[in-house]
A protein has these predicted regions:
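Compositionally biased terminal segments of proteins
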Residues: 1-242
C-alpha cells in the first residue's frame, strides 16, 4: 500500500535492483501485505556504498534534498512533481553485513527486489528493541497475520544478529505498549501480539543462507560492485529507518 507520490516514484527506482540494492523496512512489508501506508524507501546492500554509481544510475537523487550523507548512509527527500504532500524519503545503507536467512523476492511489477518475509520480521524484531514506535508493532502484527511464525522470526533475528539479539527480551517488548507513540497502537494488534507471545513455542535454529542480501540470478539481474568483498561478520545494529 503506497501513497500516490511513492507509486509515482517507483519507476525511477527501477535501477536499484541492478545496483544490488534490496528493499527492507515498512515499505517492503507493505508491498507484500498491504497493511498500512509507508512513506519511506530503505535500501540495503552488503557492499560499501558506491555513491557515484548510485547517482549515475538514479540521477534524480542528486537533485533531491540531502538529509544525511555519510560513507555508508545516503538519505534524501524527493519532491515528486504533481503530487502534493511531504517529500518521499529514500535511504541507501551500505556495508550491511548480517546476511539473509530467506530468499529475496521481486515485486509484482518487476521493479524492485525486497527482503524475504522472514528477513523482514527478523530485522523488525531487532529494530523494535532500539526504539518505541507504533509502526514497528503494526508491521510485526501484519507479518504474523500473513502467516509468518513469531518463533521463526525470533530465530531469524538470532541468526542475523547473534548475541546482540535475545529472543526473551523481544518477547517482553512485544507486549510492552508504552513509550514513544506506541500508545496509539490499535487494540486488534495489541491482542494479536499478546496472544502470539503467550502461545510462543521453542525458537528454532535458523541459519544465515548468504551474505549477499540480493538474489543473483533472480528475475532482475544484479550488477557486480567493484568495492571489494563484504566485511565478514554481521552488523549487530540495523539502521533504524527500518
Amino acid at each position: 500500500m503506497l501513497p500516490p507520490a511513492q507509486r509515482a516514484l517507483l519507476p525511477l527506482l527501477g535501477p536499484a535492483a541492478a545496483l544490488g540494492l534490496t528493499l527492507y523496512g515498512g515499505t517492503a512489508i507493505a508491498l507484500h501485505v498491504g497493511h498500512r501506508q509507508s512513506v519511506d524507501f530503505d535500501f540495503f546492500i552488503e557492499r560499501a556504498l558506491d555513491r557515484s554509481r548510485l547517482l549515475k544510475a538514479m540521477p534524480f537523487l542528486g537533485s533531491a534534498l540531502v538529509l544525511q550523507d555519510e560513507p555508508d548512509t545516503f538519505t534524501v527527500a524527493v519532491v515528486v512533481d504533481d503530487y502534493p504532500g511531504p517529500p518521499v524519503k529514500v535511504s541507501v545503507f551500505g556495508s550491511i553485513t548480517f546476511g539473509r536467512v530467506g530468499e529475496p523476492e521481486v515485486t509484482d511489477d518487476g521493479l524492485l527486489v525486497t527482503a524475504s518475509l522472514l528477513d523482514l520480521l527478523g530485522t523488525k524484531l531487532k529494530v523494535m528493541l532500539q526504539r518505541a514506535e507504533a509502526k514497528d508493532y503494526q508491521d510485526i502484527a501484519a507479518l504474523l497475520r500473513h502467516g509468518v511464525r513469531l518463533e521463526d522470526g525470533l530465530g531469524a533475528a538470532r541468526a542475523l544478529y547473534g548475541k546482540a539479539f535475545q529472543p526473551q527480551e523481544a518477547l517482553r517488548a512485544l507486549t510492552y505498549f508504552e513509550g514513544g507513540d506506541v500508545a496509539r497502537l490499535g487494540q486488534a494488534d495489541r491482542d494479536l501480539l499478546a496472544r502470539t507471545v503467550a502461545s510462543a513455542g521453542m525458537v528454532p535454529e535458523v541459519v544465515v543462507r548468504s551474505g549477499t542480501l540480493g538474489a543473483p540470478g533472480a528475475a532482475l539481474p544484479l550488477a557486480p560492485f567493484d568495492s571489494g568483498p563484504p566485511t565478514p561478520g554481521g552488523d549487530p545494529h540495523p539502521p533504524e529507518p527500518i
